């Protein structure tokens, strides 16, 4: 049963990230604009996201940072901490961007820091220095939009 629950959380996580940025308008989401940050020569809005307890879901204690390109409004980078399964922090970089019937699809490289206690805001600096460890790649293949019947 523990394996099934962990697998279910993993699938939910993939679906959550695939639906970004649309889920950021959920009523349980608390957003804080932290200004503009330059990453690899491009400017990004840095947005901190947390969740209200009520309607915030099972993982309401998780926190996120999103870096949104000021020109395209696409999320190119994100970082998050999580409590489940022993907790930790992760950083993701978007790759393989493509449009499917106007909807942005993208894959991610999933990184972990050497120090699990690092702050979310420090992860982008560690990424730019090449100091994060690649843990996995999230590849969203065969993306298709089905008619809403």
Task: Annotate each language-model stretch with its function.
Residues 45-143:
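Gly/Pro-enriched, hydrophobic low-complexity segments
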Residues 148-149:
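Short, solvent-exposed mixed-charge patches
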